Design a protein with these regions (language model features):
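A contiguous, basic/glycine-rich beta-loop/short-helix subdomain that forms a polymer-engagement track
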Residues: 1-57, 102, 110-114, 132, ...
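Conserved motor-coupling elements within RecA-like helicase/translocase cores
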Residues: 63-68, 78-146
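Structural recognition of the conserved hydrophobic beta-strand(s) that form the central parallel beta-sheet
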Residues: 6-9, 121-125, 148-151
Length: 198
């Protein structure tokens, strides 16, 4: 209220439009992207538990990496990024991965620079979701672009969309997919009790 004019730009304002209107008295306008998106959303895979989900993620990532894709795996916290790293140690110890979280954020620029290279596997917390521009190599572009995995659903869909927005930027191709376990916290909190018993 102290500012005569306020404005901003983001790819995820639509989800927050009610809050922006109610709290700040602001409206939003959708602006079409400069280039048509080439992103392919591969949907959602659902698993009975987190252990099964992590095992399949590692198996899928190993295949994608061997085929020349660059993969970004997004998670909510340092703890879960370490759990995913442990799953790679268990099921694919020969596959090198990079971890980008608050513990090693000093290395962020160099990790991001390598994340778009052929076969790269980057495990990252939400710090990689907003504003990070992963440049992909021509060989990755030729294999379909950056592949983003939402390995842990966030409480707010806007954060997941920010992560998805790391792929298929500026006319590049890219793919995204979500992996969900029925026993992870966000599912347990929001899934109706009757469905949890199925």
């Amino acid at each position: 209220q102290r500012l005569p004019r306020i404005g901003g730009m983001t790819g995820t304002a639509h989800e927050a439009r009610l809050e922006l209107g109610k709290v700040y008295g602001l409206g939003i306008t959708r602006v079409p992207t400069h280039q048509i998106t080439r992103r392919k959303n591969l949907g959602c895979r659902v698993f009975e538990n987190k252990d099964e989900k992590l095992r399949v993620i590692v198996e899928d990532v190993k295949k994608l990496s061997l085929n020349g894709h660059a993969i970004l795996i997004g998670l909510k916290s340092v703890l879960t990024s370490q759990e995913v790293a442990s799953a790679f140690d268990k099921y694919a110890e020969d596959l090198p991965i990079e971890i980008l979280n608050a513990v090693n954020n000093a290395e962020e620029n160099s990790i991001v620079a390598r994340a778009g290279q052929c076969g790269a596997v980057t495990v990252a917390t939400n710090m990689a979701g907003r504003g990070t521009d992963i440049k992909i190599s021509q060989s990755v572009r030729d294999t379909g672009g950056l592949h983003v995995i939402i390995a842990e659903t966030n409480d707010f869909s806007r954060i997941d969309r920010q992560l998805i927005g790391r792929c298929a930027r500026q006319g590049d191709p890219g793919t995204c997919i979500r992996y969900v376990a029925l026993n992870e916290d966000v599912v347990v909190r929001f899934l109706p009790k009757i469905l949890q018993k199925l």
